[in-house]
């Protein structure tokens, strides 16, 4: 009985999701960019307010100076509103190449990707769960870069709704997401000189502690480094910034030097390079990285040891 109830719940969720996809795609097609945004923002603002109405304000944890900005109910509501708005793009990534969307995302550091492609090297794009990270690969694919994201879990767990959304992704001939039980597919994908989009701030898998800023370390997953070594790929830090009103900036930092990408190397050097490239963006937009930083930062005591 429980199994039947679970399947019914999933079916209802998929049906609701399919309905929302159809609605968003219809509205996007028939409204101008400005009208579409103006329609959705007040709706999502109310939804975010209701979502935060009964949540208590938690005491602020100890954090580096650049993250010590007040976390009021208002800031949480606005942040949640932006998440809802940015998630809408997942319903029509195939339309991001249209004139009304294409100018909304600019890429800095594009030369790093282009050089890797000229040299026939695959690329691992290392990112943190900062800003609208969940739409960066859509924009990259829209611009013609064959990128797939790697996530934990098993491929059988990918929902019917997610598979439906995959059909709308640019470059539909290749997968949108690969899982840890699809390493053969991943090997073939990277051997063809493609791009892998992979998080470095997940709590699963092998971990290491990397110096971050004065008095603080960062707990980092080593998967991106290990895959870059295994497949002789360039390891490039990748961040996306929400600049408001569905405008974005993707920043590609300098690739990690090859001497840091060997099995014998001190991998913390690669980790420090990645974080060093990302830190200026974190400092410029603390509101977009607060959640990720509170999960991964480790404070040192006066003797330089981790607490």
Predicted regions and their residues:
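Short, contiguous strand/loop micro-motifs
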Residues: 11, 100, 123-124, 173, ...
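Non-catalytic C-terminal accessory region of glycerolipid acyltransferases
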Residues: 118, 142, 146-148, 180-307
